């Protein structure tokens, strides 16, 4: 059954199960897993509304790209600020809004780009990104000096993420992952592409 065939309450129940399964395999505490699920669900609520609006706007003869970019940016920030509130998360929200807004605009008429499936995929990815950044910020405040990349080794991981598993670097220096620099898993602040980020279940351990 497609998620588009479900009522909202059924979709919410299904997506929670998806998020719980998605994050359950990560080598993090139960509290960290729960936080990721709750953030993903909050993001999903907002993303579904925006994608629905984008679908409507596509049928109207007036500009809508700027509106959708702003809505995605504000939605990301509203949820992310529950975990962390600083200049970096605000910059990340702006990058997210631009990227997702532009891709939605570029793929007008393609069902997936305004679908619940896309909202769920984005929510899982961005919930992990928000939490990974928050955990880095917390570790710096605690005085941790190193960080170790952890990859879920279940055959679904990217080959270069498999190779990165267990790599330890100073906390203020980036990992080099598949030729791209990342301060933490799912970090795009140094130019990492979606090839390194989308649906990534990696995390970092700090000491």
PLM region descriptions:
Residues 1-142, 206-207:
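N-terminal leader/targeting and assembly helices and adjacent pre-domain segments
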Residues 116-207:
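Acidic, glycine-rich two-metal-ion catalytic cores of nucleic acid-processing enzymes
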């Amino acid at each position: 059954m497609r998620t588009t065939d479900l009522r909202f309450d059924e979709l919410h129940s299904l997506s929670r199960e998806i998020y719980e399964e998605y994050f359950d395999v990560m080598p993090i505490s139960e509290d960290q897993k729960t936080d990721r699920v709750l953030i993903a669900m909050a993001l999903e609520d907002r993303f579904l509304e925006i994608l629905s609006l984008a679908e409507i706007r596509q049928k109207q003869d007036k500009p809508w790209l700027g509106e959708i970019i702003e809505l995605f940016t504000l939605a990301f920030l509203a949820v992310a600020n529950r975990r962390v509130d600083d200049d970096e998360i605000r910059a990340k929200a702006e990058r997210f809004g631009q990227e997702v807004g532009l891709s939605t605009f570029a793929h007008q008429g393609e069902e997936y780009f305004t679908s619940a499936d896309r909202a769920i995929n984005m929510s899982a990815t961005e919930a992990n990104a928000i939490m990974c950044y928050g955990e880095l910020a917390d570790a710096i405040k605690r005085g941790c000096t190193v960080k170790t990349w952890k990859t879920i080794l279940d055959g679904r991981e990217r080959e270069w993420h498999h190779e990165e598993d267990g790599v330890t670097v100073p906390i203020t220096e980036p990992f080099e992952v598949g030729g791209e620099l990342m301060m933490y898993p799912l970090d795009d602040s140094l130019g990492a592409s979606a090839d390194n980020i989308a649906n990534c279940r990696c995390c970092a351990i700090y000491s």
